[in-house]
C-alpha cells in the first residue's frame, strides 16, 4: 500500500523500514542542527523520538531553525517539534523533555531504552555527559561539533573526534574525552576556518533583548554570540541524520 514512506522503501526495503519504525532516537538539542536531524529522521520513517531541550523559540532563531517562524516564537522548541513530527507521521511516538541535560539530572534518563543518541547541544559539560552515558550503556551516539561562525556547508564531514581539525569546539572535546578514556566518537564537524563576526551582537542584546519571556538561555547571558546562516546548521543536521539512518539499517558501532 502506498504511504508517506513508499519512496524511501524503494531504497531501503521493507525490512529496514520496519526496523526504523521501531527505532527510538533521543535527540538532545532541538536547535539549528538538532531540528533538521529530527526532520530528516521522521521523514525517513523513524517512529519513536525523545526530544530534549528546555529552550523556547526566539525571534533570532528564524534565520536557521526549522521550527522557528513568527507563529512559533515564544513556544517551547520540543512542543513545536513534536507537533511537526505528528503532522508528518501521526503514528509516531514522541516524548518531550523540557530540561537542559546535565550531570545533575542525568539519573532521570534511561539511555538503555534508546536505539540511538544524538548530541546536538552547545555546552561542553552537557555534551560530555551525554556521550559518556551513551558509551556506558552501549548505545550508538553521534555528536555535532560547531556550526556557528561558518559559511561553507560543503566543509562538513563525518569523522572520528580525534581526526577533527580547525573546529574550536572539537578541540575542547578531544581534550576532555581523552581525559575520560574515550577511544573513539563519531562526529560531524566542519574543517572550515571560523569566520569572525562583523559585529558584537551581545552588546545590542543587553539593551534590546528579544528573547521570549521565560527563555532559559537568554542572549544577555552569553559572552559571545556566533553568527549563523540557514544553509550551514541544516546541512550538518542532514548529514547526521543520514549517518543515523545508515547505522540503524545496518549494525552501528558504539
How should each PLM-predicted stretch be described?
Residues 46, 51-89:
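Glycine-rich phosphate-binding loop and adjoining beta1-alpha1-beta2 segment
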Amino acid at each position: 500500500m502506498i504511504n508517506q514512506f513508499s519512496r524511501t522503501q524503494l531504497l531501503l526495503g521493507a525490512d529496514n523500514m520496519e526496523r526504523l519504525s521501531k527505532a527510538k532516537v533521543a535527540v538532545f538539542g532541538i536547535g539549528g542542527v538538532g531540528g533538521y536531524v529530527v526532520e530528516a529522521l521522521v521523514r525517513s520513517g523513524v517512529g519513536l523520538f525523545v526530544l530534549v531541550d528546555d529552550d523556547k523559540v526566539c525571534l533570532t532563531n528564524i534565520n536557521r531553525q526549522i521550527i522557528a517562524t513568527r507563529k512559533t516564537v515564544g513556544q517551547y522548541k520540543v512542543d513545536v517539534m513534536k507537533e511537526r513530527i505528528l503532522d508528518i507521521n501521526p503514528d509516531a511516538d514522541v516524548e518531550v523533555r523540557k530540561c537542559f541535560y546535565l550531570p545533575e539530572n542525568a539519573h532521570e534518563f534511561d539511555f538503555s531504552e534508546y536505539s540511538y543518541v544524538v548530541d546536538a547541544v552547545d555546552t561542553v559539560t552537557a555534551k560530555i555527559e551525554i556521550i559518556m552515558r551513551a558509551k556506558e550503556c552501549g548505545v550508538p551516539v553521534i555528536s555535532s561539533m560547531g556550526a556557528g561562525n561558518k559559511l561553507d556547508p560543503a566543509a562538513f564531514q563525518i569523522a572520528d573526534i580525534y581526526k577533527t581539525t580547525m573546529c574550536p569546539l572539537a578541540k575542547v572535546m578531544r581534550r576532555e574525552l581523552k581525559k575520560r578514556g574515550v577511544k573513539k566518537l563519531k562526529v560531524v564537524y566542519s574543517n572550515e576556518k571560523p569566520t569572525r563576526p562583523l559585529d558584537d551582537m551581545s552588546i545590542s542584546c543587553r539593551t534590546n533583548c528579544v528573547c521570549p519571556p521565560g527563555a532559559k538561555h537568554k542572549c544577555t547571558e552569553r559572552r559571545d554570540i556566533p553568527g549563523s546562516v540557514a544553509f550551514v546548521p541544516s546541512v550538518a543536521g542532514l548529514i547526521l541524520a543520514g549517518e543515523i539512518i545508515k547505522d540503524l539499517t545496518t549494525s552501528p558501532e558504539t
